[in-house]
Amino acid sequence: MSFSRLYRLLKPALLCGALAAPGLASTMCASRDDWRCARSMHEFSAKDIDGRMVNLDKYRGHVCIVTNVASQUGKTDVNYTQLVDLHARYAECGLRILAFPCNQFGRQEPGSNAEIKEFAAGYNVKFDLFSKICVNGDDAHPLWKWMKVQPKGRGMLGNAIKWNFTKFLIDKNGCVVKRYGPMEEPLVIEKDLPCYL
């Protein structure tokens, strides 16, 4: 058996940590191609709104709301307003909010990262904003691919994100515990927070 054939056969096991060191496995599993191996959100990384790579392991021990945002959607005002409110009231209790701009729905997030950051500043956003990404399709960010297939992250009528402001509640261990549709306002999540904070 050639080395390249052997490598192809063993690559999934190596990448998922069956043969690799635990620290190395958690870094490798969250790559663009091997997101299925991840066991928690903490195994991923993403660029923040300023283009700096952020290891999502920094959210270990925190309850997180992860959402796709857009600045020109009919649901923008209510979502930004309520997310800012939730963050203000629960950040000291350990809540973190991760907002990922996305232009896939009605092209309602057309601006640059700098323009998105300026827009969010108008709402006095203090939660974490990330660089613009795709949430559906082959180019979707690996975190979003992973969240959509988790047992409690699956959607109605298929797992694809249907519109702006789909929200995922993530527990302190980095596991998806609930998915909220785009028509559900952020304050709906508040009733579920005491179980996880």
Swiss-Prot record:
Superkingdom to which the source organism belongs = Eukaryota
Phosphoserine: residues carrying this PTM:
40
Active site, per annotation: 73
User: Where is coiled-coil annotated?
Assistant: none
**Entry-linked SUPFAM superfamilies:** Thioredoxin-like
GO CC terms in record = cytosol; mitochondrion; nuclear envelope; nucleus; protein-containing complex
Q: Which reactions are catalysed by this chain?
A: a hydroperoxy polyunsaturated fatty acid + 2 glutathione = a hydroxy polyunsaturated fatty acid + glutathione disulfide + H2O; 2 glutathione + H2O2 = glutathione disulfide + 2 H2O; tert-butyl hydroperoxide + 2 glutathione = tert-butanol + glutathione disulfide + H2O; cumene hydroperoxide + 2 glutathione = 2-phenylpropan-2-ol + glutathione disulfide + H2O
- EC number of the protein: 1.11.1.12, 1.11.1.9
Instruction: State the InterPro entries in the record.
Output: Glutathione_peroxidase, GPX_AS, GPX_CS, Thioredoxin-like_sf
Q: Name one GO molecular function term.
A: identical protein binding
GO aspect biological process, one term: apoptotic process
Matching entries from Pfam families are given as: GSHPx
Keywords on record: Cytoplasm, Developmental protein, Lipid metabolism, Mitochondrion, Oxidoreductase, Peroxidase, Phosphoprotein, Selenocysteine, Transit peptide
How it assembles, according to the record, is: Monomer. Has a tendency to form higher mass oligomers. Interacts with FUNDC1; this interaction promotes GPX4 recruitment into mitochondria through TOM/TIM complex where it is degraded by mitophagy.
Please state which protein family the record places this protein in. Answer: Belongs to the glutathione peroxidase family.
Q: Which PANTHER family match?
A: GLUTATHIONE PEROXIDASE, PHOSPHOLIPID HYDROPEROXIDE GLUTATHIONE PEROXIDASE
Q: What does this protein do?
A: Essential antioxidant peroxidase that directly reduces phospholipid hydroperoxide even if they are incorporated in membranes and lipoproteins. Can also reduce fatty acid hydroperoxide, cholesterol hydroperoxide and thymine hydroperoxide. Plays a key role in protecting cells from oxidative damage by preventing membrane lipid peroxidation. Required to prevent cells from ferroptosis, a non-apoptotic cell death resulting from an iron-dependent accumulation of lipid reactive oxygen species.
Q: What is this protein called?
A: Phospholipid hydroperoxide glutathione peroxidase
Q: What is the lineage of its organism?
A: Eukaryota, Metazoa, Chordata, Craniata, Vertebrata
In the UniProt record, the gene name given for this protein reads: GPX4
